[in-house]
Curated annotation (Swiss-Prot):
This is Lactosylceramide 1,3-N-acetyl-beta-D-glucosaminyltransferase. Residues 31-377 are lumenal. It holds the Pfam family Galactosyl_T. Belongs to the glycosyltransferase 31 family. It comes from the Eukaryota. GO terms for molecular function: lactosylceramide 1,3-N-acetyl-beta-D-glucosaminyltransferase activity. It comes from Xenopus tropicalis (Western clawed frog). It is an enzyme of class 2 (transferase). The keyword Transferase applies. The chain crosses the membrane at residues 13-30. It catalyses: a beta-D-Gal-(1->4)-beta-D-Glc-(1<->1)-Cer(d18:1(4E)) + UDP-N-acetyl-alpha-D-glucosamine = a beta-D-GlcNAc-(1->3)-beta-D-Gal-(1->4)-beta-D-Glc-(1<->1)-Cer(d18:1(4E)) + UDP + H(+); a neolactoside nLc4Cer(d18:1(4E)) + UDP-N-acetyl-alpha-D-glucosamine = a neolactoside IV(3)-beta-GlcNAc-nLc4Cer(d18:1(4E)) + UDP + H(+).
């Protein structure tokens, strides 16, 4: 009896310990609702419904509704930027009024139109999309500075909405509206943040290799089955009232993506009949594209919000990398140095860079960059 009693107490102790562990785990999972569990739920939800038609129907509004596509006045507009030219790539850089130093750095590096024209026989156009200074104290002087800057470079496109995070969808509408009105012949359109590096030589070479009449083309870092962020402490917080569903349609990270001209036209058309109050611009882009039946394609060398490793073997393949402000000159020198390109030439060079890329991209602890599969491409 004594042994049985001890065994019983020991069994009860382990049951209690197990119960405490399970309860603690459940509490942790509840706290992490916007993380792993939410992603699992949203991804399952995405494949169960297999269609977002009901989202499109719910967010559709008549063109004359106030929550439909707004119309803002151009304060600065370079309407003759394309001039009916044969434009391979129209590159929009999303910028803020105060970021003049970033714009100047881009003009000298990856946004250098003359370099691409002379070295790659390709016509690209780079313009900066922005709103107005949100701080009323600074707005007057900032606007004067922007006018002076545009007189020198003729590459600013500005409308009279406040340039804030919650107006990013308005900046998206500015871009596709401007394409529709002033540069409809551009074969490809890119949207990029002003804190990324775009390897324009690699990008232009890739775009030139595509069929002439490429359609339904949309590439970038694709987010599939992503859930809305419900934490009010996040700047990406989206309330249920704005978007009540468990996952978004597939979309590309807003840091950088490229579309063909027909996709740009379709997105613009869809945006005219959708509720524009959703301020997460890349998600809104995904909803517009989904309404028109356009599906994003994953390109392994678009880093999205990630940052590429610093290595010549990476530079040979990279398209975009995020989080670059003070190193654009260095990256541009690497991008335009023929010795860097020749590093991966030949059988030995190719094998060397393959091995280096595997070592750089396939670390389990290094996830915020290109995927491991990029090393094999």
């Amino acid at each position: 009896m004594l042994i049985s009693a001890r065994r019983l107490r020991r069994c009860q102790f382990f049951q209690l310990l197990t119960s405490c562990f399970v309860l603690s785990l459940m509490a942790l999972l509840v706290q992490e609702d916007n993380s792993l569990i939410n992603h699992v739920k949203s991804y399952s939800y995405r494949y169960l419904i297999n269609s977002y038609d009901f989202v499109n129907d719910s967010l559709s509004v008549p063109r004359d509704r106030p929550d439909g596509a707004p119309s803002y006045r151009y304060l600065i507009n370079n309407r003759d930027k394309c001039q009916n030219e044969d434009v391979l790539l129209l590159l929009f850089v999303k910028t803020s009024p105060e970021n003049r130093r970033r714009r100047n750095a881009i003009r000298k590096t990856w946004g250098n139109e003359d370099y691409i024209r002379s070295q790659y026989a390709a016509n690209i156009k780079v313009v900066f999309a922005l709103g107005i200074e949100a701080d009323p104290v600074k707005s007057h002087q900032t606007q004067k500075d922007l006018v002076i800057e545009n007189k020198r470079f003729n590459d600013l496109i500005q409308q009279d909405f406040k340039d804030t995070f919650h107006n990013l969808t308005l900046k998206l509408l500015l871009q596709f509206g401007w394409v529709n009105s002033y540069c409809p012949s551009a074969k490809f359109i890119m949207s990029a943040d002003d804190d990324i590096f775009v390897h324009t030589p690699n990008l232009v070479s890739y775009l030139k290799s595509l069929p002439i009449e490429t359609q339904d083309f949309w590439i970038g870092r694709v987010h599939r089955g992503s859930p809305p962020i419900r934490s009010k402490t996040s700047k990406y917080y989206v309330p249920y009232e704005m978007y009540p569903w468990s996952s978004y349609p597939d979309y590309t990270a807003g840091a950088a993506y490229v579309v063909s001209k027909d996709v740009a036209a379709k997105v613009y058309e869809a945006s005219q009949t959708l509720n524009t109050s959703l301020y997460i611009d890349d998600v809104f882009m995904g909803i517009c594209a989904n309404k028109m039946g356009v599906v994003p394609q994953y390109h392994v060398y678009f880093a999205g919000e990630g940052k590429a490793p610093y290595h010549p073997c990476i530079y040979n393949k990279m398209i975009t990398s995020h989080g670059h402000l003070d190193d654009l000159d260095y990256l541009w020198r690497q991008a335009t140095d023929p010795n860097v390109k020749s590093l991966s030439a030949g059988v030995l060079g190719g094998a060397y860079c393959k091995l280096v890329n595997i070592m750089l991209l396939c670390k389990l602890s290094y996830v915020d960059t290109y995927p491991c599969s990029a090393a094999w491409s």
